[in-house]
Design a protein with these regions (language model features):
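Active-site beta-to-alpha loop of glycosyltransferases that engages the nucleotide-sugar donor
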Residues: 1-10, 31
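Short beta-strand/loop segment that forms part of the nucleotide-sugar
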Residues: 22-32, 50-54
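Catalytic core and acceptor-binding pocket of nucleotide-sugar-dependent glycosyltransferases
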Residues: 151-190
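Short, acidic, metal-binding catalytic loop of nucleotide-sugar glycosyltransferases
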Residues: 13-22
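Short, flexible, basic/aromatic active-site loop/helix in glycosyltransferases
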Residues: 139-157
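Conserved donor-nucleotide/metal-binding helix-loop-beta segment in metal-dependent transferases, i.e.
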Residues: 105-129
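Short beta-strand-to-loop acidic/aromatic patch adjacent to the donor-nucleotide binding site
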Residues: 91-101
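Active-site-proximal specificity loops/subdomain of glycosyltransferases
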Residues: 36-89
């Protein structure tokens, strides 16, 4: 989550209302002010909040944005935080963005059995209704409730070029963006 406490609260409320089974919730936060995180923790005491290594920098950037209007660098993505959380998770886990809300009952124990049966080690829940994104992926059915989504054009760069393009090393992606060569949807194609 990045400074979207109302989305996060709604997401957590939907989990409490619609998700059943044996599970724990870990919030990976990348810059939500402590005032909001405290309220969220008070309202949802069972969750664990893990802050990114860039948390303090993001908080400072938000404060500076509010004070002077200086733009927040949206290209600093907490990939290390996500990677560590996935690496240290149980064999089966769900990663959910804060702007995704459950609207129907699901049972994570049932999903775990489906994942075991179909050899799925990462299940990301989300809405696949954006037809614009569909042109870049192949979608196939695993079960009635679970779809497999695979990129049509998977870029396999050497690590250095991956860091440049996907992790914005040396502000490479930012430069391409400012030159008009890429936009915010470019990475979705790969």
């Amino acid at each position: 989550s990045f400074n979207r406490p109302f989305y996060l609260d709604r997401c957590l409320q939907s989990i409490e209302s619609f998700v059943e089974g044996d599970f724990c919730v870990k919030v990976l936060d990348d810059g939500t002010p402590e005032t909001y995180l405290s309220k969220i923790k008070e309202k949802h005491p069972k969750i664990e909040i893990i802050k990114s290594e860039n948390y303090q920098n993001k908080i400072a950037a938000i404060a500076e944005n509010l004070q002077s209007g200086k733009e927040i660098d949206g290209f600093t993505i907490p990939t290390n935080l996500w990677y560590k959380a996935a690496k240290n998770a149980s064999d089966y886990f769900m990663m959910i963005e804060d702007d995704v809300w459950f609207t129907h009952k699901i049972n994570v124990n049932d999903l775990q059995e489906i994942c075991k049966k179909n050899q799925i080690s990462l299940l990301k829940l989300g809405w696949l209704g954006n037809k614009k994104d569909d042109e870049f992926v192949e979608i196939s059915e695993i079960t009635e409730e679970i779809l497999r989504v695979e990129p049509k054009n998977l870029l396999l760069f050497p690590e250095f070029f991956n860091d440049l393009f996907f992790y914005n090393k040396f502000k490479f992606f930012t430069i391409l963006y400012k030159l008009g060569i890429v936009d915010n949807s470019t990475k979705q194609k790969y």
